[in-house]
Amino acid sequence: MSQLSSTLKRYTESSRYTDAPYAKSGYGTYTPSSYGANLAASFLEKEKLGFKPVSPTSFLPRPRTYGPSSILDCDRGRPLLRSDITGGSKRSESQTRGNERPSGSGLNGGSGFPYGVTSNSLSYLPMNARDQGVTLGQKKSNSQSDLARDFSSLRTSDSYRTSDGYRASDGFRIDPGNLGRSPMLARTRKELCALQGLYQAASRSEYLTDYLENYGRKGSAPQVLTQAPPSRVPEVLSPTYRPSGRYTLWEKNKGQASGPSRSTSPGRDTMNSKSAQGLAGLRNLGNTCFMNSILQCLSNTRELRDYCLQRLYMRDLGHTSSAHTALMEEFAKLIQTIWTSSPNDVVSPSEFKTQIQRYAPRFVGYNQQDAQEFLRFLLDGLHNEVNRVAARPKPSPESLDHLPDEEKGRQMWRKYLEREDSRIGDLFVGQLKSSLTCTDCGYCSTVFDPFWDLSLPIAKRGYPEVTLMDCMRLFTKEDVLDGDEKPTCCRCRARKRCIKKFSVQRFPKILVLHLKRFSESRIRTSKLTTFVNFPLRDLDLREFASENTNHAVYNLYAVSNHSGTTMGGHYTAYCRSPVTGEWHTFNDSSVTPMSSSQVRTSDAYLLFYELASPPSRM
């Protein structure tokens, strides 16, 4: 595996410095390789390499997971770009710098799901907390080792009866009327075993029914290879297990027609309702806390929330040439349900999960995943479905080298919008300037790349505490490319020592900063727990701008947190309400108020900043 920096890969693996752009006079020409293809290459960089498939000749350790696996279990790391996602569009993914990661993955999380949770509820109908059964915290406390022994001793039987009750493997009988009871309510081990067997049997039946209804139609074929039955639960509790579920596991929507149910649009005024506070929790479907954390952060993104609540996305769905709009529709319905539910309600995102795993099959099943990867796939899918460009124009071989950098960046942005123009992009996409200067002749070449987020290395200076500005300065600092890293200068016509540097040409409305919590060890990947001190208000990034600007001040409104290790852990979210301005902790189905002084922790992984309103002119 090459140990060249990821930034170098973006420079040297494209044809900019070896073929047309840097080695010849056409550097900066807008072609797929100079403005688009290299962006795909930046996403192919293994900043968070996936765990390699286990084979008899592989000595790489297989990651632990605390939930059921699927056939895609080996594909756990940073995903490769799929042609069905990017299509003709080759936009940048996250912009990052740093050495390639050794074998490992991102910060996988999702083990903190309630015991016995399944994903068979196919609607966004919220469940009131008053009817949600008993939590572990309400029962007599037991040590984790005792719980682990009790849960690991459970056994289930594949045989069950539908008329006279369920007969477990040890002969203990339970009436079907107890179907709504959670295994947590069992009074004896026999009853616990029988209830668990009943749940698994019912889940297998419902999973098969759901699969046939979705994929069994004549002439249709499943878009996914396989899916693990959602009823499977960990045999031993994860070290990061958190009892966050407080709902009746098998509560069904009565009176609904057969087939996959879909949530109806909210019928009351979402903006005037006192209960519309966006404080509904999300059910953990089984290792899906990474998804819940990101969804809550996006739900509290003011302009994206309004885009869904006011149904503005409907006018953009007709512009796309693709007939696939289910992901945007389900995402909007989920946001609408969250904001029309009462506080402490719990919403099941099962239909949304069905759509995201159809768009990105790597999320099929119930493996722990990296939240930043999920965010990138989700934003890419939403953007594609509401892209205002019906037919993308062919790239023109127009040379922009003769233009000043400011005008060149403006023209590059215009060409980008000719192909990629959506409300999602309006909010999250910025523009990064990359410069490469030859130390011999002084020739400087520039290229402008769109970005959806910035992956920041964690600075070592000031350990054990660094500031977010330290990380930004490390991201934008000058790097010397020498030795084997030398690119070819088109003016010198030889490989020369060069200096590369990043700066922000265009700041997005929503700036997502990804803290790269990965160690530099070549033996194995471990998580960095360094505390990064980040501001909640007035994050001034003007010193990182390519040109003078007074509009680069941000305020924090959401944080996605990861606790645990790179092998497994749990995700939560801290979000500031766009309505009340108050902070809340979103831990799957649990939503609790918090103080702004509690937002900064060493578990912060993704920071969501919104551009502050420009000062009014007198």
UniProtKB/Swiss-Prot annotation:
<dbReference type="GO" id="GO:0005634">
    <property type="term" value="C:nucleus"/>
</dbReference>
<dbReference type="Pfam" id="PF00443">
    <property type="entry name" value="UCH"/>
</dbReference>
<dbReference type="GO" id="GO:0043153">
    <property type="term" value="P:entrainment of circadian clock by photoperiod"/>
</dbReference>
<dbReference type="GO" id="GO:0005813">
    <property type="term" value="C:centrosome"/>
</dbReference>
<dbReference type="GO" id="GO:0031625">
    <property type="term" value="F:ubiquitin protein ligase binding"/>
</dbReference>
<feature type="region of interest" description="Necessary for interaction with MDM4">
    <location>
        <begin position="416"/>
        <end position="516"/>
    </location>
</feature>
<feature type="active site" description="Proton acceptor">
    <location>
        <position position="570"/>
    </location>
</feature>
<keyword id="KW-0833">Ubl conjugation pathway</keyword>
<dbReference type="InterPro" id="IPR038765">
    <property type="entry name" value="Papain-like_cys_pep_sf"/>
</dbReference>
<dbReference type="GO" id="GO:0005737">
    <property type="term" value="C:cytoplasm"/>
</dbReference>
<dbReference type="GO" id="GO:0006508">
    <property type="term" value="P:proteolysis"/>
</dbReference>
<feature type="binding site">
    <location>
        <position position="489"/>
    </location>
    <ligand>
        <name>Zn(2+)</name>
    </ligand>
</feature>
<keyword id="KW-0479">Metal-binding</keyword>
<keyword id="KW-0090">Biological rhythms</keyword>
<dbReference type="InterPro" id="IPR050185">
    <property type="entry name" value="Ub_carboxyl-term_hydrolase"/>
</dbReference>
<feature type="region of interest" description="Necessary for interaction with MDM4">
    <location>
        <begin position="1"/>
        <end position="213"/>
    </location>
</feature>
<feature type="binding site">
    <location>
        <position position="441"/>
    </location>
    <ligand>
        <name>Zn(2+)</name>
    </ligand>
</feature>
<keyword id="KW-0472">Membrane</keyword>
<dbReference type="GO" id="GO:0032922">
    <property type="term" value="P:circadian regulation of gene expression"/>
</dbReference>
<dbReference type="GO" id="GO:0050821">
    <property type="term" value="P:protein stabilization"/>
</dbReference>
<dbReference type="GO" id="GO:0016579">
    <property type="term" value="P:protein deubiquitination"/>
</dbReference>
<comment type="similarity">
    <text>Belongs to the peptidase C19 family. USP2 subfamily.</text>
</comment>
<feature type="region of interest" description="Disordered">
    <location>
        <begin position="246"/>
        <end position="274"/>
    </location>
</feature>
<keyword id="KW-0788">Thiol protease</keyword>
<keyword id="KW-0645">Protease</keyword>
<comment type="function">
    <text>Hydrolase that deubiquitinates polyubiquitinated target proteins such as MDM2, MDM4 and CCND1. Isoform 1 and isoform 2 possess both ubiquitin-specific peptidase and isopeptidase activities. Deubiquitinates MDM2 without reversing MDM2-mediated p53/TP53 ubiquitination and thus indirectly promotes p53/TP53 degradation and limits p53 activity. Has no deubiquitinase activity against p53/TP53. Prevents MDM2-mediated degradation of MDM4. Plays a role in the G1/S cell-cycle progression in normal and cancer cells.</text>
</comment>
<dbReference type="GO" id="GO:0016020">
    <property type="term" value="C:membrane"/>
</dbReference>
<keyword id="KW-0131">Cell cycle</keyword>
<keyword id="KW-0378">Hydrolase</keyword>
<dbReference type="GO" id="GO:0048642">
    <property type="term" value="P:negative regulation of skeletal muscle tissue development"/>
</dbReference>
<dbReference type="GO" id="GO:0004843">
    <property type="term" value="F:cysteine-type deubiquitinase activity"/>
</dbReference>
<feature type="binding site">
    <location>
        <position position="492"/>
    </location>
    <ligand>
        <name>Zn(2+)</name>
    </ligand>
</feature>
<feature type="compositionally biased region" description="Polar residues">
    <location>
        <begin position="255"/>
        <end position="274"/>
    </location>
</feature>
<keyword id="KW-0862">Zinc</keyword>
<feature type="active site" description="Nucleophile">
    <location>
        <position position="289"/>
    </location>
</feature>
<dbReference type="InterPro" id="IPR028889">
    <property type="entry name" value="USP_dom"/>
</dbReference>
<keyword id="KW-0963">Cytoplasm</keyword>
<dbReference type="InterPro" id="IPR001394">
    <property type="entry name" value="Peptidase_C19_UCH"/>
</dbReference>
<dbReference type="GO" id="GO:0046872">
    <property type="term" value="F:metal ion binding"/>
</dbReference>
<dbReference type="GO" id="GO:0045931">
    <property type="term" value="P:positive regulation of mitotic cell cycle"/>
</dbReference>
<feature type="binding site">
    <location>
        <position position="438"/>
    </location>
    <ligand>
        <name>Zn(2+)</name>
    </ligand>
</feature>
<dbReference type="GO" id="GO:0048643">
    <property type="term" value="P:positive regulation of skeletal muscle tissue development"/>
</dbReference>
